[in-house]
Amino acid sequence: MAAKDVKFGNDARVKMLNGVNILADAVKVTLGPKGRNVVLDKSFGAPTITKDGVSVAREIELEDKFENMGAQMVKEVASKANDAAGDGTTTATVLAQAIVNEGLKAVAAGMNPMDLKRGIDKAVIAAVEELKKLSVPCSDSKAIAQVGTISANSDETVGKLIAEAMEKVGKEGVITVEEGTGLQDELDVVEGMQFDRGYLSPYFINKPETGSVELESPFILLADKKVSNIRELLPVLEAVAKAGKPLLIVAEDVEGEALATLVVNTMRGIVKVAAVKAPGFGDRRKAMLQDIATLTAGTVISEEIGMELEKATLEDLGQAKRVVINKDTTIIIDGIGDEATIQGRVAQIRQQIEEATSDYDREKLQERVAKLAGGVAVIKVGAATEVEMKEKKARVEDALHATRAAVEEGVVAGGGVALIRVASKIAELKGDNEDQNVGIKVALRAMEAPLRQIVINAGEEASVIANSVKAGEGSYGYNAYSEEYGDMIGMGILDPTKVTRSALQYAASVAGLMITTECMVTDLPKEDKADMGAAGMGG
């Protein structure tokens, strides 16, 4: 086992504080509408330029191991805030730095660290309650656009795109961000259910100009098995041909003789057919087939429940207004499924989301809800260079998380104003002893830090503006972008309540642990022993 280096008391805390300050100083220059960029060197390719706090934090590793421990703990604050709300990473870092700096001053002055931490925790619990009272629901698309704009660093086009996407696919809809091909940002909305499986044979194509298959008012056969024998399909094909409608077959696979016969029938114009593989694998495939059945009022033909493909009738088939299939995707538009049944299915999947343990499962279930409930929107980010593209894509993703958080828990006045108002509301809070009271004051003072940092980044005098804002009431604050005072909510400067709450809770949690640190242990650097010179050979 390697030898260890151990530091105690003030020596340890000073080193840790240096690390906290180095990381936080690098992150906090990005805060607010006039925050600056940080350039991150990459071992290959062009450097990354970012205004995203957590991206900056993740890059920082310090040479001194004790300082690095402090930096890594603050990095944890930014990561946790990012995981919980998807934004507010810089605010969380600024709050943590303020609490640690003020708290360690109090420890150096002889206060009991454990009571300080208890005081800080009391203040945060009270502050979160007050934040909830200040919160306003975020329901209309104007407010959603404003939240998106603020989170994307005052980029209005991004805010509008996100609001438009949410309007089209609903609050539950899946919105994804992709790299576009042009200079302009674009929004693609896919209404209906889309899944990532294309046609099984290019001979099904009936729209050569777009390379796609389009079926109008088709019947949809859903089979949870491989189909290789055409005999199994004949009864259904004959019934569909009599009805004079096209047919879409969604099965685990269609191969061999069955696929060849379908292709020949299609090319001769006897019956219009297209076949695709069912989406997903294993149990997820069964569930997604059931989703399609719910959407199209069909039945999944599965041998598990004793149904045979040869005995399927038109009543077992689903129907939709239109189906579009290209090389990689299938879209089912306007299934004839009953709205109440679809909502029941959605509620069932939501229950599974609540119980899901892994993020991956949760994400997949969320996608299924979106496909049943609304649709899928894709925001394609446009930029002139790859460096700009990466930076912009990260901002748009942040803005998307922020708007989701706003819809979930509502919004409060932005620009650091909400925390100032909360601090004044709980100014009379008292702890069980004097040291806890100092802890409460540490937390209250730290709540001013985000506003001060926004003002400093805008090149103004922090104390003057902080005092003016404190003298005001409600959502009165300072707009650093236009350099004027006024009603923050009226000016559209909003922060999601969830983002502000998460930032405060995670900052206080980690900062409280750092204040109560008394000893730090790390590995001693290994000394490289000089290689022995090779012995001379006798001649």
Curated annotation (Swiss-Prot):
SUPFAM superfamilies: GroEL apical domain-like, GroEL equatorial domain-like, GroEL-intermediate domain like
Enzyme Commission number, as recorded: 5.6.1.7
One of the protein's GO biological processes: protein refolding
Compartmental location: Cytoplasm
Matching Pfam families: Cpn60_TCP1
Disulphide linkage map: none
Keywords carried by this UniProt record: ATP-binding, Chaperone, Cytoplasm, Isomerase, Nucleotide-binding
Entries under InterPro entries matching the protein: Chaperonin_Cpn60_CS (IPR018370), Cpn60/GroEL (IPR001844), Cpn60/GroEL/TCP-1 (IPR002423), GroEL-like_apical_dom_sf (IPR027409), GROEL-like_equatorial_sf (IPR027413), TCP-1-like_intermed_sf (IPR027410)
Job description of the protein: Together with its co-chaperonin GroES, plays an essential role in assisting protein folding. The GroEL-GroES system forms a nano-cage that allows encapsulation of the non-native substrate proteins and provides a physical environment optimized to promote and accelerate protein folding.
NCBIfam families registered for this protein in UniProt: GroEL (TIGR02348), PRK00013.1 (NF000592), PRK12849.1 (NF009487), PRK12850.1 (NF009488), PRK12851.1 (NF009489)
Protein name as it appears in the record: Chaperonin GroEL
Lineage: Bacteria, Pseudomonadati, Pseudomonadota, Gammaproteobacteria, Enterobacterales
Gene name per UniProt: groEL
